[in-house]
């Protein structure tokens, strides 16, 4: 008998690091965690710091921190000053020159939050890919999460890149986002944009489908002799179905005349509708970045201008948009010193 004695192959530092990152622990780290955790920590830390202490007086002429009297709904990390252009505003860059106070004043926290937030979201998406691969799942969770990433990147990065500066991006705050929505409406007529319409249909349609699906499953749960309670009559290892797809199919067939007969197609549809809505709306935002126009019904505008008695909901909205522009241009860009005489301000035909 021959016995072969060999040395165990030495493992390099990469293999050791790979094992440590993928170790089973309470909070999985993984290779994606190298990107996710530092970026998420820094983005959230910058946002909390900005909303607590940093003023927007030097960038927007506004108070935007708890220290100045704002609350959770009105505090924000504001976008940089228009004069900063598309500079990344590094702390050590020519704008701040290593001065942290000056860096905060010119809007450095916004670029810091936006860029680290973007990479943090991408890291979270990669985390779902990585864990799905390790446990043998399909990557549809990560594919679905690409929708929110597309919206975030298009709104906070691509839109201002198409405009004059980061100044035109939304600031990170609740009321600040509302102001940005009014800006999109006034300057781009966003609500009449077909990509916005498809996005709304996708998001609200997804919410409707989610509600219908959850209610239908609850309605068709099988009763369990031991525990008929909705939340306890199920174990992950049970072999039988927990609800009746046949009953659900018959119910909706009677309601609408049609119903999903295939669970796979049903759940793919639940995935497809909202994710497509998110992607389409992000494409629309990229169009706005390039100043592409929405629907224009010029014939109605011309007729309304010539005939005082003719007005449509469209022409009224156009007048509202003009009012938003006239107000925002002066208020939101004080450095431009816009002055609008009374005769150019919009008025409806009824006035």
Swiss-Prot record:
CC cofactor note: The D1/D2 heterodimer binds P680, chlorophylls that are the primary electron donor of PSII, and subsequent electron acceptors. It shares a non-heme iron and each subunit binds pheophytin, quinone, additional chlorophylls, carotenoids and lipids. There is also a Cl(-1) ion associated with D1 and D2, which is required for oxygen evolution. The PSII complex binds additional chlorophylls, carotenoids and specific lipids.
NCBIfam families xref list: psbD
Any one GO molecular function term: iron ion binding
Residues that span the membrane, as ranges: 39-59, 123-139, 151-164, 206-226, 277-293
Record GO biological process: photosynthetic electron transport in photosystem II
Oligomeric and partner information: PSII is composed of 1 copy each of membrane proteins PsbA, PsbB, PsbC, PsbD, PsbE, PsbF, PsbH, PsbI, PsbJ, PsbK, PsbL, PsbM, PsbT, PsbY, PsbZ, Psb30/Ycf12, at least 3 peripheral proteins of the oxygen-evolving complex and a large number of cofactors. It forms dimeric complexes.
Annotated SUPFAM superfamilies: Bacterial photosystem II reaction centre, L and M subunits
Record-listed chlorophyll a ChlzD2 binding positions: 116
Disulfide feature: none
Protein name in the entry: Photosystem II D2 protein
Record function comment: Photosystem II (PSII) is a light-driven water:plastoquinone oxidoreductase that uses light energy to abstract electrons from H(2)O, generating O(2) and a proton gradient subsequently used for ATP formation. It consists of a core antenna complex that captures photons, and an electron transfer chain that converts photonic excitation into a charge separation. The D1/D2 (PsbA/PsbD) reaction center heterodimer binds P680, the primary electron donor of PSII as well as several subsequent electron acceptors. D2 is needed for assembly of a stable PSII complex.
EC numbers on record: 1.10.3.9
Taxonomic lineage: Eukaryota, Rhodophyta, Bangiophyceae, Cyanidiales, Cyanidiaceae
Chemical reaction(s) catalysed: 2 a plastoquinone + 4 hnu + 2 H2O = 2 a plastoquinol + O2
Membrane topology annotation: Multi-pass membrane protein
More details: 2 of the reaction center chlorophylls (ChlD1 and ChlD2) are entirely coordinated by water.
Residues where a plastoquinone binds: 213, 260
Enzyme class: oxidoreductase
Annotated binding of chlorophyll a PD2, by residue: 196
Positions with a binding annotation for pheophytin a: 128, 141
Binding site for Fe cation: 213, 267
Keywords of this entry: Chlorophyll, Chloroplast, Chromophore, Electron transport, Iron, Magnesium, Membrane, Metal-binding, Oxidoreductase, Photosynthesis, Photosystem II, Plastid, Thylakoid, Transmembrane, Transmembrane helix, Transport
InterPro entries cross-referenced by the UniProt entry: D1/D2 (IPR055266), Photo_II_D1/D2_sf (IPR036854), Photo_RC_L/M (IPR000484), Photo_RC_L/M_CS (IPR055265), PSII_PsbD/D2 (IPR005868)
Cell compartments where the protein resides: Plastid, Chloroplast thylakoid membrane
């Amino acid at each position: 008998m021959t016995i072969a004695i060999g040395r165990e192959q030495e493992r390099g530092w990469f293999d050791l690091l790979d094992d440590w990152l993928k170790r089973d622990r309470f909070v999985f780290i993984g290779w994606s965690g190298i990107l996710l955790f530092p970026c998420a920590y820094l983005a959230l830390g910058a946002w909390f710091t900005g909303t607590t202490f940093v003023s927007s007086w030097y960038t927007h002429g506004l108070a935007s921190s708890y220290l100045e009297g704002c609350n959770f709904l009105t505090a924000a990390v504001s976008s940089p000053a228009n004069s900063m252009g598309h500079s990344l505003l590094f702390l050590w860059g020519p704008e701040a020159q290593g001065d942290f106070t000056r860096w905060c004043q010119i809007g450095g926290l916004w670029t810091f939050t936006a860029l680290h937030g973007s990479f943090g979201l991408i890291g979270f998406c990669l985390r779902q890919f990585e864990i799905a691969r390790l446990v043998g799942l399909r990557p549809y969770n990560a594919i679905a999460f690409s929708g929110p990433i597309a919206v975030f990147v298009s709104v906070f990065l691509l839109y201002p890149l198409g405009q004059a500066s980061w100044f035109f991006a939304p600031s990170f705050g609740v009321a600040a986002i509302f102001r940005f929505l009014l800006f999109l409406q006034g300057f781009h007529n966003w609500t009449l944009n077909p990509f916005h319409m498809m996005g709304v249909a996708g998001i609200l349609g997804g919410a409707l489908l989610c509600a219908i699906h959850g209610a239908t499953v609850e309605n068709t749960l099988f009763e369990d002799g031991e525990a008929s309670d909705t939340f306890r009559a199920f174990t992950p290892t049970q072999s039988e179905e927990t609800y009746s797809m046949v009953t659900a199919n018959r119910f909706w067939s009677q309601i609408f005349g049609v119903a999903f007969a295939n669970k796979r197609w049903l759940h793919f549809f639940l995935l497809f509708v909202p994710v497509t809505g998110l992607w389409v709306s992000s494409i629309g935002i990229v169009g706005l970045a390039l100043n592409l126009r929405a629907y224009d019904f010029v014939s109605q505008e011309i007729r309304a201008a010539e005939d005082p008695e003719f007005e449509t909901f469209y022409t009224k909205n156009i007048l509202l948009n003009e009012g938003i522009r006239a107000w925002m241009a002066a208020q939101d860009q004080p450095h431009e010193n816009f002055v609008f005489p009374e005769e150019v301000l919009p008025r409806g035909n009824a006035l």
